[in-house]
C-alpha cells in the first residue's frame, strides 16, 4: 500500500483558515496557529451577536415607539395595552417605522389605542 502524505490536505485546511482570517491584524492573518484561534473566537462572537442583534433592535423599536407615543400623550405601555384591546396586530418594527417616518399614520394608530382604553 502506498504511503499517504498529507501535504495537500494540510495546505487546503491552512488556506481555508487563512482566507477566513483575511483582514485581521498582524499574526492573526498570517500565522495558521494564531489565525485558527482568531477565526474560532470570531465565530463565537458572531453566534452570540446574531442573538443580541434581535434584542438590540427590539429595544430600539420600543424606544422609538415610546417617544412617538409620548408625543401623542400616551405612554408606551398604555399604547401597547390599547392596541391589544383594539385587536390591532401591528408589530413593533412597523410601529417604530410609522413613529419615525409617518407621524400622521402613527397618530391615527395612537387614537385607535386611546379609544379602546
Swiss-Prot record:
Task: Kindly list the cysteine pairs connected by disulfide bridges.
Answer: none
Q: So which residues are the signal peptide here?
A: none
Gene it is expressed from? rplT
Q: Which UniProt keywords apply?
A: Ribonucleoprotein, Ribosomal protein, RNA-binding, rRNA-binding
Q: What is this protein identified as?
A: Large ribosomal subunit protein bL20
Among its keywords, does the record have Metal-binding?
no
This chain's source organism reads Marinobacter nauticus (strain ATCC 700491 / DSM 11845 / VT8)
Citing just one GO molecular function, the answer is: structural constituent of ribosome
* A biological process from GO: ribosomal large subunit assembly
One Gene Ontology cellular component annotation held by this UniProt entry: ribosome
- Alphabetized NCBIfam families for the sequence: rplT_bact
**One family name in Pfam for this protein:** Ribosomal_L20
Protein role:
Binds directly to 23S ribosomal RNA and is necessary for the in vitro assembly process of the 50S ribosomal subunit. It is not involved in the protein synthesizing functions of that subunit.
Q: Which family does it belong to?
A: Belongs to the bacterial ribosomal protein bL20 family.
Q: Which PANTHER family match?
A: 39S RIBOSOMAL PROTEIN L20 (PTHR10986)
Output the PROSITE patterns linked to this UniProt entry.
Answer: RIBOSOMAL_L20
